[in-house]
Structure formats: structure tokens, C-alpha cells
Amino acid sequence: MSSLTIGLTGANGFVGSHIAESCLKEEFQLTCLLRKTSDTTFIRDLIYTRVTGDINDENALSRFVRNQNIIIHNAGLTKAKNESEYMEVNANGTKNILNAILQFNPKIRRFILISSQAAVGPTSSSEPLDESIPKRPITAYGRSKARAEEICQEYSNKIPITIIRPPAIFGPREKDIYEYFRIINKGIQPVIGQENTFSVVSIQNLVKGILISIHKQNKNLECYFITDEGDYTWDQFSSMIADQLNKKPIKIKIPNWIVIIMVGINEVYSKIFKKAVLLNKEKLKEMKQTRWVVTSQKATKELGYRPVLTTKQAIAITVDWYKENGWL
């Protein structure tokens, strides 16, 4: 068994469960910070040490960070009722963990933050975004992730920190892009707004990038985009999904006014029932952008990152998992 000890937040979710599995395959000793109410279905068969609490619980954090060589901070909100909720969890939660590290494990080898392309915003030119581009987030979620990165910068003279920025992530267990798989499986390909181009990363490639970053000996702060090779339009991405599903979906153009009405209904629902929704004004801002394209050249050069799967291969694996688990 490896002597490397890993502390992981958000281990029960889509991304976190895959990180947890891969850490155990590497024979790392894994400790997971989980809320008392966390649904642990995805990690129920894994062997790990559980610390019960959350990223606002100082006592739990003190127990969680002790004796860890690496902390991978993956927990966070991707949907929230308002910006303050995003900030409280995504930004302040990051600060809480870093404070706990300074107090209880100041000689930690590395803190790895799983951030997002949303922290930087869409592409403003024909060239893909790289790590030198200034952050221009356009959503509350993006601003909260950008703030988390800024907090990391503030602590980087005391703690070695790596920031991983994925674009849109897909793969087994993912529940948002999954809805697109589900609709295409019904023979429909919705076309919303103008055509846009974007980067994606399969969960397998993302986890590969995270694992190799564990051994990167940067002294201060490094940031890396991790992505699949190439970029796609929604039509191209949809075609790959349809091919794996053996479907020839009918393309249905959804007028902007219908989308705006749907967003309005969702916003009212969210306010009345105090629940976060996926399709809201923030998501509409993202959908209106024409390019969400990044490059992982820095990760390739400095980390030796190479995708382990093509996007097409990863879509095939994802479709198989959705079918095997009754999602399709």
C-alpha cells in the first residue's frame, strides 16, 4: 500500500467519486469529508476513512486535514439560489480549509483546488483560453470560483497549491449533460440559439490530470486547464452521442422566446420553493456565448498530461453506463 495520504472533499458526487476510485486504485490512503446527510451511493463499495462534517465545521476540518499529504478540494455548489450562497460554499469554504491546513497541517505537500473554466469566462477571441488570460467570469458561479482561486493566491506563499480548471465535464454518473443524452435517446435534438463552440473533458481525462498533478513539485501556485483534445459545436457533440445511441434524432429549433419563458418560470419556481434550478438567468448568459474553448497545452508541457480517451470513446463508455444503470 502507498504511504501517500489523500484528503478529499465532495467524494460522494460525480467528480469526487471518480477521484476517490482512482486514488484507491493507486493504493493511496483516502480520507473523505462528508456531511451526515451525504448520499454515498457512488462510493458505498469503497474503503476510506470518513470524517463527518462540512467545510464550515472547524472541528471536522481539523480532524480532516491532519496527517494528509495532499488535500483535493472538490466540494462545491454548481447550482444555488443566489450569489451569496455560491460565495459562502465555493469561496469561503476554500478559505476555511486553507486556514485549517495552516493551523493543523502546515507542512502539507499540496492543496489541489478543483475549479472551473467558469472562473475565467468564455473565449473572447478565435484563440482558445490559456492560463495567462485574466479572469472575466460572467455568472455568479463563475465569480465564486474565481474568488476561490484568488483566495488560493493569497495563501500560496505558505501552502503549495495547484488549481485544476476543467471545462464542461461528462461521464458516468453525471446528471446535467446527461439530460441531453436522455433527450437524444428519445429521438430529439433540441437546437437552442446560435451555434457555439466549446471544450469538454471526460471524467477519465480529468481524473488523469488531477492524479498527475499530485506529484508536481511546484513551490507556489500553478493553474492548469485539463481538457479533451479538440473542441466541438453542439451539433458535432450531439452527433457523437446519437451515433453511440444508434439514433437519428430530429433537430427541433427552440425559439429564444420560449427559452426566455422557461427561464422566467424556473426563476419564479426557485424563489417560491427556495430551490436551485439548472435553467436560469445565469445559465442563459452562458448559452448566449459563442465560444467556451480552452487549451491544456500547459498541462501537457509541465505535467505530461495526455488524454487517456478520445471524446468519442468517452461518450461510448458514458452511454454504456447510463444504459447499464437504467438511466437510458
Where are these regions (language model features)?
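NAD(P)H-binding glycine-rich loop region in Rossmannoid oxidoreductase-like domains
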Residues: D39, R44, Y48-N92, V120-G121
